[in-house]
Amino acid sequence: MFNLKGRVAVVTGASSGLGRQMARALAGQGADLAILARRVERLEELKHEIEKKYGVKVLPVQCDVTKTTDIDAAVAQVKTEFRKVDILLNCAGSSKDAGILDMTDDQWDFTIATDLTSVFKMTRAFANVMKENHYGRIINIASMYGLVGNTAMGTVAYHASKGGVVNITRAIAAELATSGITCNAICPGYFETELTKPVLDTAEFQAFAKQTVPMQRYGQEGELNAGAIFLASDEASYVTGAILPIDGGYTCI
């Protein structure tokens, strides 16, 4: 079950964080990969690690997902290497954020471009490739903050971008429903990555989690990977437009 052998997955934001984690997870189920990010040296490291461990093919592609020209070049490279695309995992994201009273135009524009507009541009480009085979799985990484606000953090642009990801997912799912392509979103809560671990392991965060997360802890890597693997699989063929919170219950209270 959930075997991805023979599938080709494109993963953005693969140089670090959740993108890097998700690339490993899909490779572990047998998928060949095109891994996209701006830092190509980090992609080369991941390529060698994954190919050695899982025996799948990995194509590193330097790509700024906010730039249409970079994305078009990435599509050409992926089609040349693999001839098809089955799975698109939009993980790329970053934030230059502040509270609404202090945010600059540049902070807003950067966050929306990286976290939301990139999903539109990547999906437009790669869904056209998927349509050629009448098959595709698009998975967008949103956030629990795309579903709820959080007065404790000055992250207005981040909330707006991830809320946009939630609803663009639904719109894409409806539009492509008869094309063999599904589109779903995952809304992670607090998860440990190489970037978040220093914060999540602090006593302050542990106290915060006990107050705000019903399970009173942050998530583990495998708990998030499982959702992505399912949505990428053949078994998820009747699942589209779904918004899957994996957040320890944060959004249910």
Residues covered by each model-derived region:
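Active-site helix of classical SDR
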Residues: 123, 161, 169
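Substrate-binding pocket helix/loop in short-chain dehydrogenase/reductase
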Residues: 99-100, 107-112, 205, 209
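Conserved glycine-rich cofactor-binding loop
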Residues: 8, 15-16
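Conserved glycine-rich Rossmann-like NAD(P)H-binding loop of the short-chain dehydrogenase/reductase
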Residues: 29-45
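C-terminal substrate-recognition "lid" of short-chain dehydrogenase/reductases
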Residues: 120, 135, 181-182, 217-246, ...
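Alpha-helical segment proximal to the catalytic Tyr-Lys
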Residues: 128, 174-178, 237
